[in-house]
Amino acid sequence: MKRIFLLIATNMAILLVASIVMSILGVNTSTMGGLLVFAAIFGFGGAFISLAISKWMAKKTMGCEVITTPRDNTERWLVETVARQAEQAGIKMPEVAIYQSPELNAFATGPSKNNALVAVSSGLLYGMSQDEIEAVLAHEVSHVANGDMVTLTLIQGVVNTFVIFAARVVAGIINNFVASNDEEGEGLGMFAYMAVVFVLDMLFGILASIIVAYFSRIREYRADEGAARLAGKEKMIAALDRLRQGPETGAMPASMSALGINGKKSMAELLMSHPPLEKRIAALRAS
């Protein structure tokens, strides 16, 4: 839940700044056309900027150490395994990195299939068997091959646009209703209007998070299927079972955990970016 509230708070700050900037620029957001342009620019713009800098952000945020020259047999095996799987999946070799964390996790990020980063935690690298790590790597390579970074960015852009547009349309309706019942016809006033927009942004933002999480869970099942093809179904099941027995994740930011192997648990499954590990194992066994 903390991840969701943090995401909503960040979006609220962005929308507040966006509203001020658009007012300074004189963009009329009182009409449907102007409002839609405003919503699309900031809805998709923010999502694609995040995608464009995703590799850089991942390296800085997680302290990823990209392997350029393997220092030992473990790193050499890691790079060779990703290279083999990338060739099988028909994509350009991603950058391979390690980040220091005791959690059992890995993630993929990057602006495109042929410009990606696959990173694993030190806890996973030295706490799982080679077969299990191979399956985890195959899962991340499948995310890249499936174009999940771009897909989730497009979905995020659409729901961002919906949140910005819908919140201001509803706020406008409320403002007009208040004005029609006000002798002076002034409506809510600037500060009250902004407060209403803020609350509506939060409410619609929660709905948007549920939608994005739903599509993220679907992509996880697809990545599991892809990993089963690249590394073998039994290896993937064993890897998920090992993750199920490990400690709960907590170090990875939400922007990267959506394409990680092991997602954070939530009180509400609707807000989870990953299906429960038990369901993922059951889906693989049934396939």
Swiss-Prot record:
Provenance organism: Shewanella halifaxensis (strain HAW-EB4)
Binding-site residues, Zn(2+): H139, H143, E220
Enzyme nomenclature, EC number: 3.4.24.-
Chain ranges passing through the membrane: 4-24, 33-53, 154-174, 195-215
Molecular-function GO terms, alphabetical: metalloendopeptidase activity; zinc ion binding
Translocase recorded as keyword: no
Catalytic machinery residues: E140
Disulfide bonds: none
Metal-binding in keyword set: yes
Topology of this chain in the membrane: Multi-pass membrane protein
Compartments where found: Cell inner membrane
Keyword entries, A-Z: Cell inner membrane, Cell membrane, Hydrolase, Membrane, Metal-binding, Metalloprotease, Protease, Transmembrane, Transmembrane helix, Zinc
Cofactor note: Binds 1 zinc ion per subunit.
InterPro entries hit by this protein: HtpX_protease, Pept_M48_protease_HtpX, Peptidase_M48
Entry cofactors: Zn(2+)
Gene Ontology process terms (BP): proteolysis
GO cellular component term, pick one: plasma membrane
Entry protein name: Protease HtpX
HAMAP family registered for this protein in UniProt: Pept_M48_protease_HtpX
